[in-house]
Amino acid sequence: MAAASGYTDLREKLKSMTSRDNYKAGSREAAAAAAAAVAAAAAAAAAAEPYPASGTTKRKYQEDSDPERSDYEEHQLQKEEEARKVKSGIRQIRLFSQDECSKIEARIDEVVSRAEKGLYNEHTVDRAPLRNKYFFGEGYTYGAQLQKRGPGQERLYPPGDVDEIPDWVHQLVIQKLVEHRVIPEGFVNSAVINDYQPGGCIVSHVDPIHIFERPIVSVSFFSDSALCFGCKFQFKPIRVSEPVLSLPVRRGSVTVLSGYAADEITHCIRPQDIKERRAVIILRKTRLDAPRLETKSLSSSTLPPSYASDRLSGNTRDPALKPKRSHRKADPDAAHRPRILEMDKEENRRSVLLPTHRRRGSFSSENYWRKSYESSEDCPEAASSPTRKVKMRRH
């Protein structure tokens, strides 16, 4: 049997099998030794290089992302620096107690009541959706009242066109500010009461530098809110960008603006910051060289025949001004639908003939629909036009 398999005896076969097993074992040992050598080389390379070669790509990615991160950090630093400048021009004092606030708020309600009864001069009261303004001492043209838009176009009304500052403002508000050395004696000659309903706002602006001295002093009543700096407004629907600084204003607190906060950056009241009724009394001093509307310089040929009698009765309506806004009360639900504010009132001057796809849902301005209705009464051609399919109605 051993000869048939090619081996002379059994010992030769056993010897050949042993040598084959030794070869296989040697191959395995050699492979293990080679792997150990590779591992040792890798360890030596790692000791020489702090980061593995595979980290090169990651490091390159980090280097590539550094400029982007740097731009973001630079933007944040600029924003923080601007906020610091704004804060440097702000002074806040918690000055009025709860009882004092209640007394002043009752007086503000009296002002609102007198205005509803028509007891003030025409230019004393200015109404807008969810916000009414009451000018005392000095009033000025602004926003949609201007023939030309833009900073520097504001003008003071002629003397006597707005009512005098009420005695209670002097006694309950101004005198206390003087006693605490917030303002000097005799500083204030202009007082404005802004009365906001929930959702009301005032767009970003700078108090006219050519009209008012600094500082600008305001006192808050009825509820807490916030004064925001550096916001941008967009409309239809209204949207407001993030502010550079949002300053909490508490009921009974006094806010004094000067320097950068008053002159170099806009401030506003956002709709989302008026959750309850809020009123603010703004106290300022007009500049001696502030421009003023001069009704006397207008040619008599441009004035209506009744101008002289109106002037004597105190009912002045300067033809240089645009018609006043509606004196209707704002709808309480107006805060929950798109509103047309002062900066986009130009839409109201377009054609009263609306196409079908622009029905009432596209506009919420009370004046727009009322003017459209009245125009249809004045213009029979428009009323009978086949293109006019929208039925106008008062609301």
UniProtKB/Swiss-Prot annotation:
Pfam families: 2OG-FeII_Oxy_2 (PF13532). The active site is at 140. It comes from the Eukaryota. SUPFAM superfamilies: Clavaminate synthase-like (SSF51197). Widely expressed, with highest expression in testis. In testis, present in almost all testicular cell types except elongating and elongated spermatids (at protein level). Among spermatogenic cells, present at high level in spermatocytes; medium levels in spermatogonia and lower levels in round spermatids (at protein level). GO terms for biological process: cell differentiation; gamma-delta T cell proliferation; membraneless organelle assembly; mRNA destabilization; mRNA processing; regulation of mRNA export from nucleus; regulation of mRNA processing; regulation of mRNA stability. Its EC number is 1.14.11.53. There is a cross-link at residue 329 (Glycyl lysine isopeptide (Lys-Gly) (interchain with G-Cter in SUMO2)). Disulfide bonds join 231-268. Its cofactor is Fe(2+). Residues 296-306 have a biased composition (Low complexity). It catalyses: an N(6)-methyladenosine in mRNA + 2-oxoglutarate + O2 = an adenosine in mRNA + formaldehyde + succinate + CO2. Binds 1 Fe(2+) ion per subunit. It is found in: Nucleus speckle. The modification Omega-N-methylarginine is found at residue 360. Residues 68-117 form a coiled coil. The modification N-acetylalanine is found at residue 2. Keywords: Acetylation, Coiled coil, Differentiation, Dioxygenase, Disulfide bond, Iron, Isopeptide bond, Metal-binding, Methylation, Nucleus, Oxidoreductase, Phosphoprotein, Spermatogenesis, Ubl conjugation. RNA demethylase activity is inhibited following sumoylation. Inhibition is relieved following desumoylation. Inhibited by histone demethylase inhibitor IOX1. Monomer. Interacts with RBM33; promoting desumoylation by SENP1 and recruitment to N(6)-methyladenosine-containing mRNAs. Interacts (when acetylated by KAT8) with PSPC1; interaction facilitates recognition of N(6)-methyladenosine (m6A) mRNA. This is RNA demethylase ALKBH5.
